[in-house]
Amino acid sequence: MTDQQAPVFQIQRVYLKEASLEQPNSPAILLEQESPTVDIQLGVNAAPVAEGVFEVTVTATVQTKIKDKTVFLVEATQAGIFEIRNLPQEQMNQIMGIACPQIVYPYLRGNVADLVQRGGFPPVHLSEINFQAMFEQQQQQQAGAGADAPQLVTQ
């Protein structure tokens, strides 16, 4: 195998791409005694940015409500730039759908907890995610659809 043919997988950068915190019903909602409900949605996306270079993002949406009123809404997207070359497409899809999100996700967890805490609330700690199971579920859903590239995965 020549150097040009050797498989390449390198992290170029991990960064917080987007983050927002909304408290649309503050300060009145803060006086409520009832415990809020918490809804957490996660998504993974991969997109090429150059030849052999991909951006993989993990997005979290955390919404807490008391009855039908929002206490806070956090949306955050953590991204990583990865160089991935000289691999079969199937392996590239697995790397972008499993390995890359596993690298990016701990940063997202920390940023979400920090953002919520800076908003004046107890931190929300996102649980560990089995990205392999998410990827396999996505592949089963896309079977027969002919999609080769990783697309949005939600849980």
Curated annotation (Swiss-Prot):
Keywords assigned by UniProt, alphabetized: Chaperone, Cytoplasm, Protein transport, Translocation, Transport
Statement: the UniProt record of this protein carries the keyword Ribosomal protein: no
Entry's Gene Ontology molecular function annotations: unfolded protein binding
Coiled-coil annotated spans: none
Record-linked Pfam families: SecB
Family named by the database record: Belongs to the SecB family.
Role according to the record: One of the proteins required for the normal export of preproteins out of the cell cytoplasm. It is a molecular chaperone that binds to a subset of precursor proteins, maintaining them in a translocation-competent state. It also specifically binds to its receptor SecA.
Listed name of the protein: Protein-export protein SecB
Protein species of origin: Albidiferax ferrireducens (strain ATCC BAA-621 / DSM 15236 / T118)
Gene encoding the protein: secB
